[in-house]
């Protein structure tokens, strides 16, 4: 790397390298707290292949900046191994005479017993409205948006990775969150331009 230190993610350890030539040594371990799962890294690889870009162009959106102080107080819970289930895709038109956020709560309530639920909204305002609507129904949600304070965002990201039956509500980058036992994904206002990443490669929540 031209004599410079660069950051990387340890994906796996093997007894013998798969490539020939000189290998660089790991000079420093920044954290023992996992920041991704095999499934989330596979998703990142798939998206980068689909958009013909470097995986790091996707990782900068997918994984929030590390906050060391959060990791010091973080206690990882036991992850639930997801079993294979039939994937279904459903388009639902919301009723015009009922608040959209209340209708999303109904969908969450319908699916939360099967596992964790992820709701992606186009902007911060919609995220807050959905979280408020969930709170009225005594449902707690983890918020994941780029506008959050770094500490709060990173803490919620790690909590989503290790909590059971969690409800996560966020903006577009939350689509990559390695949520424990994720079973349901709801994309609110899927035609909104805010679901497009503004930086290259310009992925869309719906496509991911």
Regions flagged by a language model, labelled:
Residues 1-208:
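Accessory, non-ATPase domains that flank or precede helicase/AAA+ motor cores in DNA-metabolism machines
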